């Protein structure tokens, strides 16, 4: 198990697993089992209540609205942590990557709209706005020390803001007809979670029952995408621990002294007194970690190595068997997505960064050259999972969805290769 743990502990591992999952989906979609592959994810699964189906959705729907809700829950936890004490805590230190992220979302959307304005394909404008943080950071960490630490922080902060932007786009622009009664119940459950947080409730069971059985289900029934419920629920999770740092340190020092005073035996097992002390240390350590960070720590590897690969396998498969070049480019969807990601992302990020530096609103991070900035802009054009997710919300027509996926693949592959080549070359600081 040690090699597996070491692999999962590496920053680049998530990107590698995701890439393999995308490759597997492409293979499955273009072999003689393609029909079974597509049919499998269309099978229904749900509940029967009083003889009536309840939440009776396809496996594809469950993955996109259920499993991906866990992904967005972790995104919400990360956003809250960053707002409280992370990269987004001090707006002055993050003004440049925040501005770059906004530019990197606006320009791709404008390019797409410029090519598709006035057509039914307009709804796909949100597809080229998103960056796949797992892939982008995976490439950066593959390069190791060739990318300065300041550049990694810049890209991470940019990706965090990009995630927040994607969440807001989904909430406001990719929501179907609303059931206000269900939505009202959803916000009522959120209010109870908020009140529980303010009252100092730190029980995982309390937030799990209200978050899943209350907020997620009601938002799913309301018409608002259930992933938004996950982000909102994450913001209700307590960020403070049951005991503060000073109390924890006092307890640990006291318990350590007790442990030292216990009579040690000459065998490999511990004395009962020592076991009791270590049990208390284990308990105090667990309650010294905020529930927010406990959940983030436990769920992050599940999201990276289980949920994201499943999502990729279910959504990344494109069958090229009966797909011609004329089919792909019969509309401007593929072109809009490709140019939006491949050109729009770098232009938006680099242009906004240069403008803010010229206006002296911010300064370029130390040790970050112009070539590094361009390389990071290219890596931001890797859309993959987030772009594919938005494409499933934007298009119901299979051909348009396929065109969007082709555009995402083209831009992500070219952007990833281009960014890697640029960042792999040592440069002098600008």
Can you name each region flagged by the protein language model?
Residues 17-30, 71-77, 107-109, 189-194, ...:
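Hydrophobic core segments of alpha-helical transmembrane domains in multi-pass membrane transport
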Residues 51, 56, 61-85, 236, ...:
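Hydrophobic transmembrane alpha-helices of secondary-active transporters
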Residues 28-40, 54-58, 74-89, 107-126:
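Transmembrane alpha-helix boundary signature
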Residues 61-72, 120-134, 175-188, 227, ...:
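Structural signature of hydrophobic alpha-helical transmembrane segments
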Residues 82-109, 179-188, 322-344, 374, ...:
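Entry/N-cap segments of selected transmembrane alpha helices
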Residues 4, 9-10, 205-208, 214, ...:
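Predominantly late transmembrane helices and immediately cytosolic-facing juxtamembrane segments
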Residues 2-5, 74-89, 137-148, 191-202, ...:
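C-terminal ends of transmembrane helices
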Residues 140-247, 252-253, 257:
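Functional cores that coordinate and move charged inorganic groups
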């Amino acid at each position: 198990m040690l090699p597996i743990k070491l692999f999962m502990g590496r920053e680049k591992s998530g990107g590698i697993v995701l890439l393999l999952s995308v490759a597997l989906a492409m293979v499955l979609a273009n072999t003689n089992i393609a029909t079974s592959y597509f049919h499998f994810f269309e099978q229904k699964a749900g509940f029967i209540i009083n003889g009536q189906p309840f939440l009776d959705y396809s496996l594809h729907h469950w993955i996109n609205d259920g499993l991906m809700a866990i992904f967005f829950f972790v995104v919400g936890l990360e956003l809250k942590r960053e707002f409280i004490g992370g990269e987004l805590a001090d707006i002055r230190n993050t003004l440049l990557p925040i501005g770059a992220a906004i530019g990197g979302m606006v320009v791709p959307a404008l390019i797409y709209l410029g090519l598709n304005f006035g057509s039914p394909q307009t709804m796909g404008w949100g597809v080229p706005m998103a960056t796949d943080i797992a892939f982008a950071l995976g490439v950066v960490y593959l390069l190791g020390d060739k990318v300065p630490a300041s550049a990694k922080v810049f890209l991470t902060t940019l990706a965090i803001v990009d995630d927040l932007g994607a969440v807001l786009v989904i909430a406001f622009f990719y929501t179907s007809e609303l059931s206000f009664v269900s939505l009202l119940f959803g916000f009522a459950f959120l209010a109870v979670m908020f009140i529980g947080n303010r009252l100092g409730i730190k029980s995982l069971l309390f937030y799990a029952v209200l978050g899943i059985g209350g907020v997620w289900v009601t938002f799913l029934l309301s018409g608002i995408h259930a992933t938004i419920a996950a982000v909102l629920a994450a913001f209700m999770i307590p960020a403070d621990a049951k005991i503060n740092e000073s109390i924890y340190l006092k307890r640990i020092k006291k318990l350590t002294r007790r442990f030292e005073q216990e009579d040690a035996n000459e065998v490999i097992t511990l004395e009962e007194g020592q076991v009791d002390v270590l049990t208390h240390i284990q308990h105090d350590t667990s309650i010294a970690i905020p529930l927010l960070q406990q959940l983030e720590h436990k769920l992050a590897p599940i999201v990276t190595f289980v949920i994201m690969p499943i999502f990729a396998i279910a959504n990344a498969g494109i069958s090229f068997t009966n797909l011609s070049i004329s089919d792909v480019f019969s509309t401007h969807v593929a072109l809009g997505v490709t140019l939006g990601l491949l050109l729009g992302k770098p232009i938006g990020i680099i242009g906004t960064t240069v403008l803010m530096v010229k206006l002296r609103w911010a300064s370029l991070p130390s040790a970050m050259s112009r070539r590094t900035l361009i390389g990071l802009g290219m890596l931001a054009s890797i859309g993959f999972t987030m772009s594919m997710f938005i494409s499933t919300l934007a298009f119901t027509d299979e051909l348009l969805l396929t065109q969007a996926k082709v555009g995402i693949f083209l831009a992500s592959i070219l952007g990833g290769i281009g960014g890697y080549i640029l960042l792999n070359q040592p440069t002098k600081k600008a």
